[in-house]
Every structure is written in structure tokens, then in C-alpha cells.
Design a protein with these regions (language model features):
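Short amphipathic alpha-helix that is part of the acyltransferase structural core
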Residues: 1-34, 129, 138-167
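Flexible, substrate/cofactor-facing loop regions flanked by secondary structure
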Residues: 31-35, 142-206
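Conserved donor-binding loop and adjoining core beta-sheet/short helix segment
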Residues: 33-90, 194-206, 212
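Short hydrophobic/aromatic beta-strand element in the GNAT-like acyltransferase core
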Residues: 48-52, 62, 115, 129, ...
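Acyl-donor-binding surface of acyltransferase catalytic domains
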Residues: 70, 78-142, 265-267
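Conserved acetyl-CoA-binding loop-helix of GNAT-fold acetyltransferases
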Residues: 82-96, 210, 216-230, 248-253
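Conserved active-site alpha-helix within GNAT-family acetyltransferase domains
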Residues: 109-127, 221, 243-261
Length: 274
């Protein structure tokens, strides 16, 4: 049985029992800010649903979903269970309530139960992500050629931007209350960009890109350096492909360190039409 959670006390003990679990802990609940955003405060949000899955009177699963009806989009913000029946029931719930929606799942790579059911539904996966957090930032790096986004570059930026993601260039431009965007400019041409949040105690780059012909010329380092400079005194975390050694070395050289046990995996699933 699935029931909407109305008070945090209904699920507090259940959620706490997953802390430190190597397979079933949730990378979206890795700190107090994420717990507040993705679980506690989500209970009162109209665009988020916190669902408890019960067997008899016992909770066997806890899930939070962001639901954007106008865009027919769902994102799992929390997924906690050690019981295959909970995953099966919540996926059936999505199939019943949100046919035709696009659904994203961000979860622990060790969660073989959820992955098994997503595999059966032909979900597509992004590469496993390594979490890194900022220790002492390396500041004072030359950032010539990098500047904050301005409207004169809107068309170039949106054309260059990765289209295969939720936060496209157009959406980032409209979300000035959430993102700062830094642009790498060469001869008045946008050759790279970095989108990064700025309203949190621990902010996060969402996308970093430099045109192929301008790579290995220091633009990626300059973009990151400018973002770190303007992020002071806040912290920063990021996710990088776990096998992308050059990018990991870049981030380590700028003051980031790997966080063990908090990698994540993202799956994309198209909920079938009825």
C-alpha cells in the first residue's frame, strides 16, 4: 500500500536507518541541507510527493518525487528501501498515475534492487558519477577571457549548450534565482560555459563545457577558478564521470577531494502510455 507522508515524524526513523548503508543509502540525502530540501521540506511542497510504501502496518519504502505536470517530467529525489516489493509497487504507481512522462532516477550504484526493475523497463543510464567536495579552494588563478553571463550572449550560449539534459540553456537563463553562468569568450565568441548554483551553503556546478578546438588551453580551469572566486565563502561539491581521470585531476588541482561511498547513478525511463 502507498500512502502520502504528511509529517516527517512518520518516516524519520525509517529514513535514518539507511545512513551509511553501502548499497541502499541515498546520495540525495548525504547532508543536512539535502535532507531538508529533498525530504522534510518536500512534504509541504505542491510539486513534490513524499510516499510511504507499507506492508501491513510496517513501512518498507520511502520515496520523494518531483512532478512537473506541464513538462510531463518526474525526478526521484529520495528512494529508500531494502525490499523489492516496495520498488515494484512504486514503479507501478508511476505507471498508473503518470503515463507518458519522462522519469529520472538518481540513486546509489549499489542499489541492485532498483536497478533490476529499471533494467526490466529498458531504462537508459548515464555513467556512474564520482562525488567530490571542495576543501581549501585554489584562488588567484588568472581568469582572463571568462566573464559572467550577459544577455548579449544569450543566443550563442543557448546554441552551444548541451541539449540532452533537463537544465538546458534556455531554462538556466530563466532561473537567475538559482544559477550563475560563466562564459569563456574568445574574439567575442562564446567558446565555453559553466552553470553553477549560488544560493546554497554547498553549491554545485551543473554543466561545464568547452568547444573541442579550445580544449587543453586552460579555459576549463579558468571557468572553475572564476566560479570558486565568486562562490566564497560557501562550499561546493560536484559530480564527475567516475572514469574521467583528466577531469578528476583538474578538480583535485583546484582543491576538491573524492568522497568515498557517495557516488550516484542516473537512469532515464519513459513511463509507458496506458
Amino acid at each position: 500500500m502507498i500512502r502520502i507522508i504528511k509529517f516527517y515524524d512518520e518516516c524519520r526513523e525509517f529514513a535514518s536507518s539507511f545512513q551509511g548503508d553501502p548499497n541502499f543509502s541515498d546520495p540525495m540525502l548525504s547532508d543536512e541541507e539535502q535532507v531538508n530540501c529533498n525530504l522534510i521540506n518536500a512534504i509541504d511542497r505542491t510539486d513534490r510527493y513524499v510516499l510511504g510504501v507499507y506492508q501491513d502496518a510496517a513501512m518498507i519504502g520511502l520515496f520523494t518525487f518531483l512532478v512537473l505536470r506541464d513538462e510531463q517530467y518526474i525526478e526521484m529525489l529520495v528512494g529508500l528501501s531494502r525490499d523489492k516489493e516496495a520498488y515494484l509497487e512504486v514503479l507501478r504507481y508511476l505507471e498508473q498515475c503518470y503515463p507518458g512522462y519522462s522519469a529520472d532516477f538518481v540513486f546509489n550504484p549499489g542499489n541492485y534492487l532498483l536497478k533490476e526493475f529499471l533494467d526490466l523497463r529498458n531504462a537508459e543510464y548515464e555513467p556512474e558519477q564520482q562525488k567530490m567536495v571542495l576543501g581549501t579552494p585554489v584562488l588567484g588563478i588568472d581568469t582572463t577571457g571568462v566573464e559572467l553571463f550577459s544577455e548579449q550572449y544569450t543566443e550563442q550560449y543557448c546554441t552551444l549548450h548541451n541539449k540532452d539534459m533537463y537544465w538546458t540553456g534556455e531554462k538556466v537563463v530563466q532561473a537567475k534565482d538559482r544559477f550563475r553562468t560563466f562564459l569563456a569568450i574568445h574574439d567575442n565568441k562564446v567558446i565555453g560555459y559553466m552553470d553553477v548554483t549560488y544560493t546554497f551553503k554547498e553549491n554545485e556546478p551543473f554543466d561545464l563545457f568547452v568547444l573541442e578546438e579550445y580544449r587543453r588551453k586552460g579555459y576549463g580551469r579558468k571557468l572553475l577558478a572564476k566560479a570558486l572566486e565568486m562562490n566564497q565563502p560557501n562550499g561546493m561539491m560536484l559530480l564527475v564521470d567516475a572514469d574521467n581521470d583528466p577531469a578528476i585531476r583538474l578538480y583535485e588541482s583546484m582543491g576538491f577531494t573524492k568522497v568515498q561511498g557517495q557516488n550516484n547513478l542516473t537512469a532515464h525511463w519513459s513511463v509507458p502510455e496506458n
